[in-house]
Amino acid sequence: MINVDPPTGNYPATGGNSTHNITSESDSRLAFKVKSSNNEHYRVRPVYGFVDAKGKSKLDINRLPGPPKEDKIVIQYAEVPAEETDPMAPFKAGAQQGEIIVKLIAA
């Protein structure tokens, strides 16, 4: 129900930034949550957010200096009603519907 463009993040081991677009293919509004396999070297903003039906949301990833390594982020998503104001709420309630994995490569 969502796509991420670009689907992979490539960074120098000395650090770097990338911006990705989360695009919804759903007719419903979605909430998302981003989980990282390496919180020591990656910062992601936003961690929680919304994507409107057939809409887009921007995701910024910052790679801090560190050893070359392959990591990933997992973007979990769930349908939410239009009036939902807290993007964390569906995940606290265990409402995850699907997920997509984005590879992060530092070389």
Swiss-Prot record:
SUPFAM superfamilies: PapD-like. Residues 1-107 form the MSP domain. Expressed at higher level in testis. It comes from the Eukaryota. Residues 1-26 are annotated as: Disordered. InterPro entries: Ig-like_fold, MSP_dom, PapD-like_sf, Sperm-specific_class_P. Residues 15-25 have a biased composition (Polar residues). PANTHER family: MAJOR SPERM PROTEIN, MSP DOMAIN-CONTAINING PROTEIN-RELATED. This is Sperm-specific class P protein 34. It comes from Caenorhabditis elegans. The lineage of its organism: Eukaryota, Metazoa, Ecdysozoa, Nematoda, Chromadorea.
